[in-house]
From Swiss-Prot:
The protein's name: Probable stress-associated endoplasmic reticulum protein
UniProt keyword annotations, A-Z: Endoplasmic reticulum, Membrane, Protein transport, Translocation, Transmembrane, Transmembrane helix, Transport
Topology in membrane: Single-pass type IV membrane protein; Single-pass membrane protein
Organism lineage: Eukaryota, Amoebozoa, Evosea, Eumycetozoa, Dictyostelia
GO biological process, one term: protein transport
Transmembrane segments: 35-55
Record organism: Dictyostelium discoideum (Social amoeba)
The gene coding this protein: serp
C-alpha cells in the first residue's frame, strides 16, 4: 500500500521537526567585558576619588 502525497509530506515535515528538536543554535560569545559603562565609570570615579583624597590628606 503506497502513501498518498499529502501523507508523505506530513510525515516528512514531522520527521524534520523531530530532528530539530533539542538542537540549540550556537551563540557567539562577545569579546570584552560584560559590564555596563556607567558601572565602570562609577568604579573608576570611586577609585580615583579615594586616591586623590588620600593624597590630599597626607599633605
Amino acid at each position: 500500500m503506497s502513501q498518498s502525497r499529502t501523507l508523505r509530506q506530513k510525515s516528512q515535515k514531522y520527521q524534520e521537526n523531530i530532528e530539530k528538536r533539542g538542537v540549540a543554535s550556537p551563540k557567539k560569545k562577545e569579546d570584552g567585558l560584560n559590564i555596563n559603562p556607567y558601572v565602570l565609570g562609577f568604579i573608576i570615579f570611586v577609585v580615583v576619588g579615594s586616591t586623590l583624597l588620600q593624597i590630599l590628606k597626607g599633605q
